Amino acid sequence: MLLALALCVPLEGLASSRPVEVHQLLALPQPETPIAALTLDACGGGYDAKLIGFLIEERIPATVFATRKWIERNAEGMAMLRSHPELFDIEDHGANHVPAVIGPGRRVYGITGNPDVAHLESEVRDGAAAVEAATGNAPRWYRGATAEYDPRALRAIMAMGYKVAGFSINADAGATLRRDTIVARLDAVRPGDIIIAHMNKPESDTAEGLASGLKSLRMRGFRFVTLREMDVRPALAFHPSRI
């Protein structure tokens, strides 16, 4: 019950052990303050220099969830992120982008999870070590591959001392959406929303969609923060059409 309330995970999801998403909002001091958080996943693949260049030019901060394998393969991208610590907070996305589900043969979106708790802990711990080695800062937040978790995984991650990073607006659906759809999703952003998008697929429409959508939010008076700057709370009024 407490885990469900803390993370806004459906009770039936915890009872059935099926993977669930964690939906969260920023804990704003005043509910209508136009503040939102942009989070970017760097799973595997490449480095979206166009997107990061836009964020630097516009001075828009973001929380980046990077895997060890992305860090190892994208020295240029890591160097750019590290050169702007005032904008980018780099957090743990795991070592090898293994979903946070436990049990032989368990999968999320066709990606195999962890056979046991020990493997999950290694995925989290080794990812954190890579982030700390690359940045000099120990991560506080963890977002699992696919952003879905089963109850055992959630408990294990939190027992390791990490905060589990959720979201309330899925901007690009794994960098698969077209520009206009991304813009439309960002148009739905409200005060306190946590946006999830991707920075590892430069061939996608994510950079163009985010650039247009984030500029529009700026015109509406929004400012952006990293997850280290503000507490989060369960998205109790989360609307399914917004993911």
Located regions from the model:
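His/Asp/Glu-enriched short active-site or ligand-binding loop at hydrolase and phosphoryl-transfer sites
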Residues: 148-189, 222-233
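Structural recognition of the beta-strand scaffold that forms the well-ordered cores
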Residues: 36-39, 62-66, 89-92, 140-143, ...
